[in-house]
């Protein structure tokens, strides 16, 4: 049974570890998930391992990551949602979310994002959060606006080679 450090009504938040390659492959091996994350739209096995190691490294250094999230009723991997340090801005983090396709449209994105925002502002005392999305990812745009993020223009995102609509959410 997986241990969770944070829960919502339906979601358990855990931490990635080196034994999670199979789970990472379930998520980042799905082209519907990765098509908005990188320029090729597909993660190789090496890309998946690199991504998993990046998340583990972020946890080791900062005690945060894009945490693996699980459906509490089934313990099935939904995807990941969390935060990472954002550039050199003090006390500012980037919110990120990747969900397996079978969990799209069920409210998990909003539920998980709200928990990550609450954690950022109340536990970490973040001043603000940054978020961006692929220009063609309309669902992410709708989610960020629903969560209260404000548009700040577009920022270049090297993994896709595109300028991504970008947003900030201030901690009031």
Ranges and model annotations:
Residues 43-47, 55-57, 70-71, 98-100:
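Juxtamembrane/interface motifs at transmembrane-helix termini
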Residues 32-54, 65:
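Conserved GNAT-fold acetyl-CoA-binding loop/helix
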Residues 58-62:
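Short loop/turn motifs at secondary-structure junctions and domain boundaries
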Residues 1-36, 66, 70-172:
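Acyl-donor (CoA/ACP) binding surface of acyl/acetyltransferases
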